[in-house]
Amino acid sequence: MKEEKKLLLREVEEKITASQGFILLRYLGFTAAHSRSFRNNLSGVSAEFEVLKKKIFFKALETSGVEMDPEGGEGHLGVVFAYGDPVSAAKQVLDFNKQHNDSLVFLAGRIDNASLSGREVEAVAKLPSMKELRQQVVGLIAAPMSQVAGIMNSVLSGVISCVDQKAEKTQE
């Protein structure tokens, strides 16, 4: 193997081990402007997009000890390395894809040491984020509490109203 390829292989291995997960993509009709915009979007969620030869990527997976079946064929592959939350990166890919006429196709991914198919990665991207889930839980907890507070308020105002009416009767 040439020195350049060995260096690239080591670099990809480091990215695989440093990342929390990755998403494999096929990119269709992807212009330089799309690529730049996509990379900028991903940087906001601590992720990066690389175009790699399949052979090099799957060799790096093998030497990193990550088991994953290669998607058939030769050529290039788009890889999103997620250094933060891999689900947020998948959501960014999905959002970008919606805005750019489905120019990206999910092939596979790895999130939390689990290998996923393209459909599974897309399904994960459609799930609510942790922030959204927390908001829903707080809403579920807060709703009954506000109802209890409303009931207590109406009971207390009812008692006060009774006392006021009794006081008015005795004054007459």
Swiss-Prot record:
It comes from the Bacteria. The keyword RNA-binding applies. One of its GO terms (cellular component) is cytosolic large ribosomal subunit. CDD domains: Ribosomal_L10. PROSITE patterns: RIBOSOMAL_L10 (PS01109). GO terms for molecular function: large ribosomal subunit rRNA binding; structural constituent of ribosome. GO terms for biological process: translation. Keywords: Ribonucleoprotein, Ribosomal protein, RNA-binding, rRNA-binding. PANTHER family: 39S RIBOSOMAL PROTEIN L10, MITOCHONDRIAL (PTHR11560). Belongs to the universal ribosomal protein uL10 family. This is Large ribosomal subunit protein uL10. It comes from Chlamydia trachomatis serovar D (strain ATCC VR-885 / DSM 19411 / UW-3/Cx). The gene is rplJ.
